[in-house]
């Protein structure tokens, strides 16, 4: 599929959304009561996340970047004070973004707006919910507040996403109330290798559980759950489904259209792109290209077209993960 064809599809989707909004407005004029999103049930939270499948969520730090993301076809943005690459370089304590900046982004674009809070920081998450963000990322990119415990997310109306390096880690986050999982990768490096490793680790354990389930060996599933400190019911559900029971995005080091296509090929439901777009020298083209490659990841011709839209000379500076000290790794936070 050519780029012009993909834009035609996006325009049809846009027209459909506008038609639905107009229908809603007419219904409201006729006295229909609209239930606000803030009263969302778990079913609505999971349903909203499912609508992001197959898309790209882009990290942004201001309204201008958010507009570029929306114009490129992103399904959402994640607002930060600094991009992960800059967080890594700056050091110190990384906190949630300025609430006024988040509000400004929400007023500027029409796609869902997400924001990060520190691991274990209940009140950062509560404030993000209060101002009306669509999704909260309890993220290892920011400086953890609690090294031992994550937020109990069932108390919130807004959905959460958490990072994971393995299936047990993912299932623990889901048990705590996460509506979405993403690979941790190694954020801010421009190196997709860790995201690949984490996605394969999750897939490998799912295949093992699926094998137990098909063989009728429920006791083996119970032993897996006990030895990995995860609820048996979640392990059993995962074994029965043959996949995570929630949407699973890829994140951490995605910097090119080919990176995005690779993660989709490995089984991701979509991708988060952090520094890869706005630390490059061609953010507009790269954003469009990554969206195109994510959407048509199983079409080599289209992925090649997307990759041709960008130049390696304009890519973000990469960081060799093997040269990072253990204490410099973000992925080890919040296991």
Swiss-Prot record:
- Which pathway? Cofactor biosynthesis; pyridoxal 5'-phosphate biosynthesis
The entry marks the following residues as binding D-ribose 5-phosphate, namely 59, 188, 253, 274-275
Keyword Nucleus set for record: no
Keyword field = Lyase, Pyridoxal phosphate, Schiff base
Which PROSITE patterns did the record assign? PDXS_SNZ_1 (PS01235), PDXS_SNZ_2 (PS51129)
Sections of the chain in a coiled coil: none
Short name of any one Pfam family annotated for the protein: SOR_SNZ
Query: What Gene3D superfamilies does the database record attribute to this sequence?
Result: Aldolase class I (3.20.20.70)
Could you say which residues bind D-glyceraldehyde 3-phosphate here? 200
Against SUPFAM superfamilies, the record matches this protein to: Ribulose-phoshate binding barrel
Which CDD domains is this protein grouped with?
pdxS (cd04727)
**What's its EC?**
4.3.3.6
Catalysed reactions, semicolon-separated: aldehydo-D-ribose 5-phosphate + D-glyceraldehyde 3-phosphate + L-glutamine = pyridoxal 5'-phosphate + L-glutamate + phosphate + 3 H2O + H(+)
**GO terms classed as biological process:** amino acid metabolic process; pyridoxal phosphate biosynthetic process; pyridoxine biosynthetic process
In terms of HAMAP family, this protein maps to: PdxS
Subunit structure and binding partners = In the presence of PdxT, forms a dodecamer of heterodimers.
Query: What NCBIfam families does the database record attribute to this sequence?
Result: PRK04180.1
Q: Which family does it belong to?
A: Belongs to the PdxS/SNZ family.
So what does this one do? Answer: Catalyzes the formation of pyridoxal 5'-phosphate from ribose 5-phosphate (RBP), glyceraldehyde 3-phosphate (G3P) and ammonia. The ammonia is provided by the PdxT subunit. Can also use ribulose 5-phosphate and dihydroxyacetone phosphate as substrates, resulting from enzyme-catalyzed isomerization of RBP and G3P, respectively.
Protein's recorded name:
Pyridoxal 5'-phosphate synthase subunit PdxS
Query: Which species is listed as the source?
Result: Hyperthermus butylicus (strain DSM 5456 / JCM 9403 / PLM1-5)
The record lists the lineage as: Archaea, Thermoproteota, Thermoprotei, Desulfurococcales, Pyrodictiaceae
From the UniProt record, report the name of the gene that encodes this protein: pdxS
